[in-house]
C-alpha cells in the first residue's frame, strides 16, 4: 500500500514543481522584457 501511494504522490509533486518553475520563468522573462522596454 505504501509503495503505491509514494509513486502516485511523486508525479503530482513534479507537476506542481514544473508549474511553479514555469511561473517563475515567466516572471523573470517579464521583468527582463520590461527592463529592456524601459531602457
Swiss-Prot record:
Membrane-spanning segments: 18-38
Keyword Transmembrane: yes
Keywords: Membrane, Photosynthesis, Photosystem II, Reaction center, Thylakoid, Transmembrane, Transmembrane helix
Topology relative to the membrane: Single-pass membrane protein
Subcellular location: Cellular thylakoid membrane
Primary location class: membrane
UniProt feature coiled coil, ranges: none
A cellular component term, taken from the record's GO annotations: photosystem II reaction center
Gene Ontology biological process terms in this record: photosynthesis
InterPro entries attached to this UniProt entry: PSII_PsbL, PSII_PsbL_sf
HAMAP family: PSII_PsbL
Function according to Swiss-Prot or TrEMBL: One of the components of the core complex of photosystem II (PSII). PSII is a light-driven water:plastoquinone oxidoreductase that uses light energy to abstract electrons from H(2)O, generating O(2) and a proton gradient subsequently used for ATP formation. It consists of a core antenna complex that captures photons, and an electron transfer chain that converts photonic excitation into a charge separation. This subunit is found at the monomer-monomer interface and is required for correct PSII assembly and/or dimerization.
NCBIfam families: PRK00753.1 (NF001972)
Oligomer status and interactors: PSII is composed of 1 copy each of membrane proteins PsbA, PsbB, PsbC, PsbD, PsbE, PsbF, PsbH, PsbI, PsbJ, PsbK, PsbL, PsbM, PsbT, PsbX, PsbY, PsbZ, Psb30/Ycf12, peripheral proteins PsbO, CyanoQ (PsbQ), PsbU, PsbV and a large number of cofactors. It forms dimeric complexes.
Family classification: Belongs to the PsbL family.
Name of the protein in question: Photosystem II reaction center protein L
Organism ancestry: Bacteria, Bacillati, Cyanobacteriota, Cyanophyceae, Oscillatoriophycideae
GN (gene name): psbL
